[in-house]
């Protein structure tokens, strides 16, 4: 275990997510979910107002402004629509009217709104499952650039198309796809979610001995056997029930990375693991790998001291 880690991790218990951290994580997720649900609520309000022009369920079909909402309420997702003809869509709406809106009597408009929200809510649930990783990445990026700023290190950041001068006050800078800076050892680029050709898999956290030019708009991932410095796994889910599975998949990915790069003579490649949900048994395994240097660094995403230390370690690596 490196000296920096020894200062913040005395035992596996320091890695374990506390009850307070878990609760705070769930609250943060709930607030984000509420924020993202606002457009759906507003859509439902508009739907109710426009649908109120109809005196009976059949007349809803004559209100062209709500046609898309009727299709949604019938249970057809945006993803499914491309497989349906116009006749299929009309049939789906007609079946909803016959089976659910007509039996609702005078409450058919409320029934329509409920069904619209039900489908939208299901869509939101899927979106939130996908957004967990993005939120974790944004938290890491925000901590990373803040640490760079405190250390007085100039940096640039990549938005997926071009590079920009780094400024912590830039709106949405936490959505950066890559960050470039220099330390005493040379130029560095930290990038996220790249498909590394050597492994032939997506890697969450990628640190290269590179600059903006050699990063080459993510093309460095096609041949980084020499430039790769460190790869890491990032798991943002806060639910303790998923902690063991997060570690299993993350550990498996890291083992595959180490083996792939060892095959090209890179036994010196470093690896890291960062997660929001770390339970006792998982913490023991992670700490064991840190102790025997299988794993180079690990941090709990909910522990600010560990996260800052992790960022500081990467900056100087």
PLM features per residue range, with description:
Residues 1-143, 147:
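Nuclease-adjacent, charged terminal/linker segments that flank catalytic cores
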Residues 3, 17-18, 22, 38, ...:
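Residue-identity detector for threonine
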Residues 16, 90-93, 113, 132, ...:
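Extended aliphatic helical segments
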Residues 21-24, 35, 158, 176, ...:
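Alpha-helical structural elements
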Residues 37, 51-52, 61, 71-72, ...:
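Generic local-structure boundary detector
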Residues 70-72, 82-83, 116-203, 210, ...:
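Charge-rich, low-complexity intrinsically disordered linkers/tails
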Residues 164-317:
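Catalytic core segments in nucleotide and nucleic-acid processing enzymes
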């Amino acid at each position: 275990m490196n000296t920096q880690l020894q200062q913040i991790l005395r035992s596996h218990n320091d890695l374990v997510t506390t009850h307070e951290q878990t609760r705070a994580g769930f609250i943060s997720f709930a607030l984000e979910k509420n924020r993202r649900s606002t457009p759906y609520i507003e859509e439902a309000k508009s739907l109710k107002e426009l649908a109120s022009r109809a005196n009976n369920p059949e007349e809803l079909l004559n209100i062209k402004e709500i046609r898309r909402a009727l299709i949604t309420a019938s249970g057809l997702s945006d993803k499914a629509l491309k497989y349906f003809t116009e006749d299929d869509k009309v049939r789906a709406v007609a079946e909803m009217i016959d089976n659910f809106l007509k039996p609702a009597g005078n409450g058919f408009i409320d029934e329509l709104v409920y069904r619209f929200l039900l489908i939208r809510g299901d869509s939101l649930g899927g979106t939130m499952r996908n957004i967990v990783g993005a939120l974790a990445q944004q938290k890491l990026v925000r901590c990373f650039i803040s640490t760079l700023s405190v250390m007085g290190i100039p940096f640039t950041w990549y938005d997926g198309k071009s590079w920009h001068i780094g400024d912590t006050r830039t709106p949405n800078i936490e959505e950066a796809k890559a960050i470039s800076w220099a330390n005493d050892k040379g130029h560095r680029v930290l990038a996220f979610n790249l498909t590394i050709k050597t492994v032939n898999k997506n890697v969450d956290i990628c640190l290269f001995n590179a600059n903006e030019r050699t990063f080459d708009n993510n093309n460095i991932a096609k041949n980084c056997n020499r430039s790769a410095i460190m790869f890491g796994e990032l798991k943002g889910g806060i639910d303790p029930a998923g902690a063991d599975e997060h570690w299993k998949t993350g550990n498996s990915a890291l083992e595959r990375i180490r083996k792939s790069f060892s095959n090209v003579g890179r036994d010196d490649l470093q690896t890291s693991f960062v997660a929001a949900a770390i339970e006792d048994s998982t913490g023991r395994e992670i700490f064991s790998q840190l102790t025997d240097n299988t794993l180079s660094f690990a941090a709990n995403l909910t522990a600010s001291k560990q996260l800052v230390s992790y960022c500081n370690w990467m900056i100087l690596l």
